[in-house]
Amino acid sequence: MTISKQLLRIAGVLSFAVAIFQAVISFVPSWSLYFGAPKELVSNATILIIAGLLATIVFVIFGLYALAGAGDVRILPLLRLGLLGIGGVYTLRGLLLIPQLLTMAGILQFNESFSSQMLASSLISLLIGLLYLAGSIVGWRELPSKNKN
């Protein structure tokens, strides 16, 4: 097993873990609020559940793309582009860590403070994004493809 497949497999497992976490907190408004959901969203349980389950579906799809890149499930459409895009989304979300750290250091000023949950979420997102990108770039030539692009 190559390093790129291992990286993508880990990224996929972590995406599934995020999906499970998202699904669980979607049914408990106080947990959703604790982990950063807007108060307006939390005040309507039906919308909270729908939004949470839609996010869960997205994270499951992300996980399936990682496993497809590792060769564990069938090839998905636009696999290479999808893996890079998913890695980019996670990494961009993770880069919110920079203003959080700058604010904590007193270099930047924001009206709202950053919670430890937001900091942890940024770190996790950055880690997962880098796993997707590293696995995709390192193993670009060995990624399964119906037609090598």
PLM-predicted stretches and their roles:
Residues M1-V18:
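Cytosolic juxtamembrane helix and N-cap/initiation of the first transmembrane helix
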Residues V13-V18, G82-R93:
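Hydrophobic alpha-helical membrane-insertion segments
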Residues F21-L54, G69-V73, T103-E112:
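Interfacial loop at the N-terminal end of multi-pass membrane proteins
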Residues L53-F62, A120-G135:
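Hydrophobic cores of alpha-helical transmembrane segments in multi-pass inner/ER membrane proteins
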Residues G69-G88:
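Loop-to-transmembrane helix junctions at the membrane interface
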Residues G82-G88, N111-I128:
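Individual transmembrane alpha-helices with interfacial aromatic-anchor signatures
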Residues I86-L108:
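Hydrophobic alpha-helical transmembrane segments of integral membrane proteins
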Residues A134-N149:
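Cytosolic juxtamembrane helix at the C-terminal end of the final transmembrane segment
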